[in-house]
Amino acid sequence: MTASASRPLLGCIADDFTGATDLANMLVKSGMRTVQTIGVPAESASIDADAIVVALKSRTIPAADAVAQSLAAYEWLRAQGCRQFFFKYCSTFDSTDAGNIGPVADALLDAAGGGFTIACPAFPENGRTIYRGHLFVGDVLLNESGMENHPLTPMKDANLVRVLQRQTSSKVGLIRYDTIARGAADVRACIAQLRADGVRIAIADALSDRDLYVLGEACAALPLVTGGSGIALGLPENFRRAAELAARDNAASLPRIDGTATVLAGSASKATNAQVAAWRATRPSFRIDPLAAARGEPVVDQALAFARSHLPEPVLIYATATPDEVKAVQQALGVEAAGELVERTLAAIAHGLRALGVRKFVVAGGETSGAVVQALGVKSLQIGAQIDPGVPATATIDTEPLGLALKSGNFGAVDFFDKALRALDGAA
């Protein structure tokens, strides 16, 4: 295959929508023209891109369903001609003892072959590092970072070898930081020894971007790689080294999109709470009350009326709340029902906003982003320049043009909403 061929080289499967854009952002920064599809396309298509990211909504669904969706995505990507496959999950390893990281990794490894893969959610640029198999968020262990209070995937153990081993019958091992520090050749030797010992999946330490580049080089021959978006840093260079990927300076170009903008927030993370507070201090905002929505009050109509009264000025419509407030709603409605209600409400609001002429959406929260893009009928996205680490601007390429910034809950600076609006306006 030559560098000018249009068939994609890297096929990626992400377990949520913002995670998919996070990964696509990383690939674009590394010079790969990247297209993100929303779900598995219904039919084969000729996509002119170096990498394709299939965005699923499989992180918290039953494990068997997550496996089925992931395998369907794999088969579709394989049919497009992808040479290597990547299973992307959150940099905080969001999962439970039932999955879904372990079951999906096992199924994809069986399908792709090779008998071995790594698991590395590290993203040092965003403070996620792995040392001796333990995941840190900033300076604290994962289970002390606030993730222990996550409503759907509470992370109460920072030892990823233990966490993953509880999810899989495959033997889980570790590639230590000191091996990685010695370079790709030593990592490949470690992989060979782990395979000889019966290990199928190895957690990989990573303290810096250099470690991720080393791991990427060491994984060049693996049919399947798994991890957070950070590990994708080193994968494009493998294709360049093999003269399969051309050098590009326009991988992040997007069309300009006119129209008004709105911010929608559903995440209850610390970062999103801070971003909501910063916006509310100076800008118009409307709070969604899940309990009012559950009582049948016209919350969607009220939110749309609020937005209409302020257009063309951007407004924030949010369900973001403190952990105690979230817990109270969950106790009243049930954990799953509460989350689904918030997603359904914000999705309906997004649909209504589009009818009002809104063409640019900033969305905070992985589950919320998934619900919103589905409500807007988005099928695929072209990935543009980074707004904040892990979050790019995007534009739809298969519907009436829309600009989207889809943010994982914990990502972004305090002023992210303003920065995202400027980026979607073409000013950033």
UniProtKB/Swiss-Prot annotation:
Entry's EC annotation: 2.7.1.217
Catalytic activity: 3-dehydro-L-erythronate + ATP = 3-dehydro-4-O-phospho-L-erythronate + ADP + H(+); 3-dehydro-D-erythronate + ATP = 3-dehydro-4-O-phospho-D-erythronate + ADP + H(+)
One term of GO molecular function: kinase activity
Domain of life the protein comes from: Bacteria
Keyword Transferase among record annotations: yes
Chain residues that bind ATP: 267, 365-368, 409
UniProtKB keywords: ATP-binding, Carbohydrate metabolism, Kinase, Nucleotide-binding, Transferase
Family matches, as Pfam families: NBD_C (PF17042), SBD_N (PF07005)
UniProt enzyme class: transferase
SUPFAM superfamilies per record: YgbK-like (SSF142764)
Extent of the signal sequence: none
Annotated S-S bridges: none
Role, per record: Catalyzes the ATP-dependent phosphorylation of 3-oxo-tetronate to 3-oxo-tetronate 4-phosphate.
Family: Belongs to the four-carbon acid sugar kinase family.
UniProt name for this protein: 3-oxo-tetronate kinase
Source organism of the structure: Burkholderia multivorans (strain ATCC 17616 / 249)
Source taxonomy: Bacteria, Pseudomonadati, Pseudomonadota, Betaproteobacteria, Burkholderiales
Gene name tied to this protein: otnK
